[in-house]
Amino acid sequence: MINRLLNNLTSFFTDNRWLFSTNHKDIGTLYLIFGGFSGIIGTIFSMIIRLELAAPGSQILSGNSQLYNVIITAHAFVMIFFFVMPVMIGGFGNWFVPLMIGAPDMAFPRLNNISFWLLPPSLFLLLCSSLVEFGAGTGWTVYPPLSSIVAHSGGSVDLAIFSLHLAGISSLLGAINFITTIFNMRVPGLSMHKLPLFVWSVLITAFLLLFSLPVLAGAITMLLTDRNFNTSFFDPSGGGDPILYQHLFWFFGHPEVYILILPAFGIVSQIIGTFSNKSIFGYIGMVYAMLSIAVLGFIVWAHHMYTVGLDVDTRAYFTAATMMIAVPTGIKIFSWIATLWGGQIVRKTPLLFVIGFLILFTLGGLTGIVLSNAGLDIMLHDTYYVVAHFHYVLSMGAVFAFFAGFYYWFWKISGYTYNEMYGNVHFWLMFIGVNLTFFPMHFVGLAGMPRRIPDYPDNYYYWNILSSFGSIISSVSVIVFFYLIYLAFNNNNTPKLIKLVHSIFAPYINTLSKNLLTFASIKSTSDSSFFKFSKFFIFFMVSLSVLFIFYDSLLCLNDHTNSWKIGFQDPTTPIAYGIIKLHDHILFFLAVILFVVGYLLLSTYKKFYYGSLNNDLPESKRISLFDTLINTYKENLSFNVTNRTYNINHGTTIEIIWTILPAFILLFIAVPSFALLYAMDEIIDPVLTVKVIGHQWYWSYEYSDYSVVYSNRMLDYDSIDRFAAMEMMYKGMGYLKDRSLLSYLYIPMVIPETTIKFDSYMIHEAELNLGDLRLLKTDMPLFLPKNTHIRLLITSSDVLHSWAVPSFGVKVDAVPGRLNQTSLYLKNTGTFYGQCSELCGVNHAFMPIEVYVVNPVYFYNYVYIYFKNFNLI
């Protein structure tokens, strides 16, 4: 078998058809094979991540936090640059764009070849970067100073940068090729408004690549020179600013999200048009919705940076601009549903993946509305809520669309047909697996669990084990997928319709149509196996739900109910109360939208499913709901312009309706969002100022204006009896010695011109006392008074950190060279915990925040006694 494999590899590299090919179909096939290989690597990385997070403590990585950081970095790079982009743009784009526009090939065939062959060495460099010294553990954002020569002194980050450069050049060359091909090589008569929607999506994606990738190239080149040539673009010690890198990166990074999802939109449009036996509803609206998404995608980049210290007006602008993207996205969702309504729905594997895409992408988009609010994002930034959001958009958006397109075009590409039953098994396993993996992440994110950590407090255990179990199901679905391909190529089931694979579209090349691929070869076969399988899975899902509800109800009887917490931590500041109230307000509207989308999909499927295109569809069924609505009010749909009468067709009217309605919903969401945002920015004259400094191992705190605050400003003289009990306690602890506690009440603090400074380290698990919380207990907590206006000044001494306490509603980045500030007004006493939520090296999971909120009557005296005992005063 090994000799056979070596012979195949040798023949591959000596066969000019593949190595030096200029045929767009062969190059597209190479992209698909390369993307599949990269997808396996990325899936393995994701499985390692989920196995490590299956339980608290070290599971499979032996406590190597840097290795965990390297794996999450490689997982993101591989999935984005070497799986989704190659298969969606390079694979399907190369295969079908020339065919859909009637072109003999791409405009620059040799350029097409080199654009592919830049990807394997790029992937090789990325994988090598993981093996050089300790690897590149920077996250896919590669933020400095963590990516600087001080924090990553080896060549790993340099290799990762070179890998990104090669992948970027490959994408730029491909984008130029697609733009030239689509503009110059269409058959005569095929205008831009007659292009298939998949071609439009690839064209818009190519422009996004052309405008965004040079910015990324500039950012990582400046980072490279900072690391190796002593420049200081992002080094605060030399006058640079690490936030500049974030602006440059996200100017590329957010359009990159639409680079990944726009080809998916095109694929979904093709499949829905085919399997509903209808043309796409609102074609022009769909095109301009994609154009609007592309334009808006360039002006919303800073919604990834709400916590870095942007002023309130800037955050308000990016909140509004980000919300606007929901309008064209909603147009596309409802246009797809309108296409299905009134059609002749054929239930095949591609359509199953498309319906799954519609439901799950809608859910991911709605959580994006939540995160677009600068006020809410303060609580959710860099938590697993964000991870859940973008995986619902990508893992269940782009990837589901890829599988839909793969099954849809499989026989057109390979000449073989796949087993429909295994295709359905693949869909259901993947649908269940990805939901079980990512839906619980919303709950741990709301509870404040930081992302990109290899270890977590025990309270997050149950949701994480559920996510890890879901990832195993998803991996099984991938195995089923590759087994399906194996069966397709080894069962000799070539359909009779296909004579020559590479000339399959020849009879259709010059057909002037909005969609050259609306034809389909769907056999009229029995679906009995599918129905049996569907019944089994429905029974399985219902049984699993019943068992889960029963198990959850049993958990309510013991002490572990907090581990299944599905909401925010208990608030203790007015800001935290406001954030939770705003979240509930927004969630109501989003739940209604999700219900409407789900109801429309289910009712459409129930009403218009006919099993096969060969069945006759009663004419009464072809009248859509939207036609009925419009015909009712047809008399009111005309208007005069310059003495001419124009009738608004049903597509335009409906699109106007579902453009205005989402805009009104966004308005209802935006008004309280802006009110909360500006309220959060108000800093009342503080009684106490605390400076917070982040380090890679610990936090430092300074009561910087302690010397000007006197204890008797805040005393409640009716509470003197409490001090008698406190005095006995302190004397028992050896703090007061011979002095009375009451002597501290009536005289100013005896520490004029003194600033209290102390460091706060995590207490390791072996040193914890009974009842202490693992990963959250510190040796020196921060003391803050209740019902007092407090100002926090936050900065960093080395890399980026984030001071985040969920119960306070506070999350502020600690940036070297900057001094960010926020205000606190604490309403409850108690002990509150938080963690650093920014990736800051190997110690990311080991920088807890412990805050004691005490009664102001006791605060100054208690602080003085406590720190005097540790010789800090």
Curated annotation (Swiss-Prot):
There is a cross-link at residues 254-258 (1'-histidyl-3'-tyrosine (His-Tyr)). It is found in: Mitochondrion inner membrane. Cu cation A binds at residues 801, 836, 840, 844. GO terms for biological process: electron transport coupled proton transport; mitochondrial electron transport, cytochrome c to oxygen. O2 binds at residue 258. Residues 1-474 are annotated as: COX1. CDD domains: CcO_II_C, Cyt_c_Oxidase_I. Mg(2+) binds at residues 381-382. It comes from the Eukaryota. SUPFAM superfamilies: Cupredoxins, Cytochrome c oxidase subunit I-like, Cytochrome c oxidase subunit II-like, transmembrane region. Its EC number is 7.1.1.9. PANTHER family: CYTOCHROME C OXIDASE SUBUNIT 1. This is Cytochrome c oxidase subunit 1+2. It comes from Acanthamoeba castellanii (Amoeba).
